Amino acid sequence: MKVDVLVAEIGSTTTVVNAFKDLDSENPVFWAQGQAPTSVLEGDVRIGLQGAIDDLCRKMNIDSLEYDEMLATSSAAGGLKMTVHGLVYDMTAKAAREAALGAGGIIHDITVGRLRRSDLARIKEINPNLILIAGGVDYGERDTAIYNAEMIRNMGLHTPVVYAGNIENQDEMKLIFDEESGQELYLVDNVYPKIDTLNVEPCRKVIQEAFEDNITKAPGMEHVRDMVNGPIIPTPGAVMECTKLLYDCIGDCMVIDVGGATTDVHAVTEDSDAVARILTAPEPKAKRTVEGDLGVYV
């Protein structure tokens, strides 16, 4: 049997595949689904992926499955663990947090101001997949983000860094996170370029690029990447993109994603005049919250 697209979701507890047919017709079909336990502990996520495909074949009473394209998302091996470091919580740190959550990140720590020894100890303990540094409006305060970058660089980590702060600091960041640092640097537009202005979408896209570049930490994922068409993005980020598409069709909407390990709530809405009058800080059009350890594992 051959389908147009097979979509794989390699979750923290369960791997699910969904098969779609007739996508170029007026009546596209969601044809079948299969699932199996995610196999990180077995040392290769492809075991769980093949198990999910085998489950689909059993349900549809077919011997094998072929497909023109394969797409994939992942939250295996803990998903996209991030730490976020800004200048003021209600401004740059909050903007960076919204960008990270919207991209599908799981934020394990947020700091404001200059990093202290206890902050550095937490970062080392968390061992994040990605570090996001922000701070300062464009052409405003510079020193805090530079100080924090230097402290993180001196930790000797090999964790990629996204810088989304004052654009005047970008050349400094290149000097701090040079080749000798062993840390890949991603530069992006400021998430908080001026007072009461959020600019989170460019940062979200770069975070997802960084995730895809470094997804091979889940055993076997490097082989899955060779199988798929296009990037592998964090599962929560994929749900956010779907929520945005749903918004284009029906308007303001909320999506609740009950996973095996976490429950995510996504919302896409334009502020009403009544809400705008009582807001004390800007909110992004698309936003996500996440509650860890509140999933439903079946």
Language-model features: where?
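Residue-level signal for short segments within beta-strands and strand-turn junctions
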Residues: 19-23, 86, 267-269
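Asp-based phosphoryl-transfer active-site loop
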Residues: 6-16, 75, 257-263
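Short helix/loop capping segments that flank catalytic or ligand/cofactor-binding pockets
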Residues: 16, 141-142, 172, 264-266, ...
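Glycine-rich phosphate-binding loop of actin/hexokinase-like ATP-binding domains
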Residues: 27-28, 34-38, 244, 249-298
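Nucleotide/phosphate-binding catalytic cleft detector across ATP-hydrolyzing
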Residues: 1-7, 23-28, 33-252
